[in-house]
Amino acid sequence: MSDKKIKVTLVKSVIGTKQSHRATVRGLGLRRLNHTVELVDTPAVRGMVTKVAYLVKVEA
């Protein structure tokens, strides 16, 4: 019963980005540069990652 997980890392600063993109990064649980979180791979999380793909790095 292990759900598939992905690791998301913030690799670019949110300074100068849209407010909604900053909120999405916070919604993913990322707080500072090079901060990594492990999230369950759901369509909602995938959509958030796609929205801010230019700010984050994703590992399976």
Swiss-Prot record:
Keywords: Ribonucleoprotein, Ribosomal protein. The lineage of its organism: Bacteria, Pseudomonadati, Pseudomonadota, Betaproteobacteria, Rhodocyclales. This is Large ribosomal subunit protein uL30. It comes from the Bacteria. Part of the 50S ribosomal subunit. One of its GO terms (molecular function) is structural constituent of ribosome. The keyword Ribosomal protein applies. Belongs to the universal ribosomal protein uL30 family. NCBIfam families: rpmD_bact (TIGR01308). The gene is rpmD. One of its GO terms (cellular component) is cytosolic large ribosomal subunit. The keyword Ribosomal protein applies. GO terms for biological process: translation.
